[in-house]
From Swiss-Prot:
Annotated Pfam families: S-AdoMet_synt_C, S-AdoMet_synt_M, S-AdoMet_synt_N
SUPFAM superfamilies attached to this UniProt entry: S-adenosylmethionine synthetase
Example GO biological process: one-carbon metabolic process
Keyword set, alphabetical order: ATP-binding, Cytoplasm, Magnesium, Metal-binding, Nucleotide-binding, One-carbon metabolism, Potassium, Transferase
GO MF annotations in UniProt: ATP binding; magnesium ion binding; methionine adenosyltransferase activity
Primary gene name: metK
Top-level EC class: transferase
Pathway where this protein functions: Amino-acid biosynthesis; S-adenosyl-L-methionine biosynthesis; S-adenosyl-L-methionine from L-methionine: step 1/1
UniProt cross-references to InterPro entries, sorted A to Z: ADOMET_SYNTHASE_CS, S-AdoMet_synt_C, S-AdoMet_synt_central, S-AdoMet_synt_N, S-AdoMet_synthetase, S-AdoMet_synthetase_sfam
Name of the protein: S-adenosylmethionine synthase
Reaction equation(s) it catalyzes: L-methionine + ATP + H2O = S-adenosyl-L-methionine + phosphate + diphosphate
Organism this protein belongs to: Magnetococcus marinus (strain ATCC BAA-1437 / JCM 17883 / MC-1)
Residues engaged in binding ATP: 16, 168-170, 234-235, 243, 249-250, 266, 270
Amino acid sequence: MPRNYLFSSESVSEGHPDKMADQISDAILDALLAQDPLSRVACETMVSTGFCTIAGEITTKAVIDYQKIARETINAIGYTSADTMGYSGDTAAIFVALDKQSVDIAQGVNEGEGIDLDQGAGDQGIMFGYACTETDVLMPMPIYYAHRLMEKHAELRKSGELAWARPDAKSQVTVRYVDDKPVSVEAVVISSQHSPDVDHDTIEKEIIEKVIRAVIPAELLHEGTQYFINPTGRFVIGGPVGDAGVTGRKIIVDTYGGMGSHGGGAFSGKDPSKVDRSSAYMGRYVAKNIVAAGLAEKCEIQVAYAIGVSQPMSVMVDTFGTGKLDDEAITELVKKHFDLRPKAIVQQLDLLRPIYKKSAAYGHFGRELPEFTWERTDKAAALRADAGL
């Protein structure tokens, strides 16, 4: 009997307070890497009513204006008036509390130091990569459309077409699966911060017509699709005034929307020596190439590291019964075609560049921007040939 179920994923806008924090942390990371590609960065941001705090550990030769970067990032998102929006990059108090990277950690990461003379992992941990055939970019459908809805919302807000819209927003997409294949969108939830002078009917009509129907293909929608637009009825107070925001609190939004697994490590504000970020990007690259090669319809890879050690503790591939080869054989292909040591990951994906602010909203995966090397499928042909397909 065909398996019939619903699966939902959410996204948030660039104006959501947690995403604001992610973007500030990654804007700082980019500025540091632009001057000193070997910067060691662990930058955490918190935003709340009237202020922004930047903390963490940074070792760098770069000299940057942390406050200026934070203010510019906040204003670019759209928080430009404390009077009308409750928050502004121009008037928020910016606190900076930074230290250097621990020398104990550094000796395990610096090449030629510590017990393993190769560049070791910046921490222990488990990282996952995932890909599937549900969309052209090999991402799960629910998170893919949840992100696209938020991108469209921001586009129309900034152009003035949604004149009432303000930066804070969230989306959620529920997809029906039959035999593990997506067949329809059953529900869409969008909550958008708005000006106090617009009525709910206008918000509902414009979100459905200008955002949802512009993004989700008509063949996926049907008469029974449910739309929940600002279901509380009012969303005037938003952004950092409505909720405090902190770097690294949207890790499922950042990845696969709850489909597949997550090792728990956040991305934003971390330089590529942190395997939380670089190995998760590599995992996406590996999984996407396996699926692009036709070795499986769905693929998840887990990689584990120990701090200061270059070689992974373990590598595991799961194709959920969709593989053309058994999972053990695909795991061996991965070990043959991909070097999973931290320094090799940085080199293969060219990660010592100021490319991270773009990743900090609307998903780190599934957007085929030129800078996002982990979205390339340049290993697919070699994998397919080696598999004998």
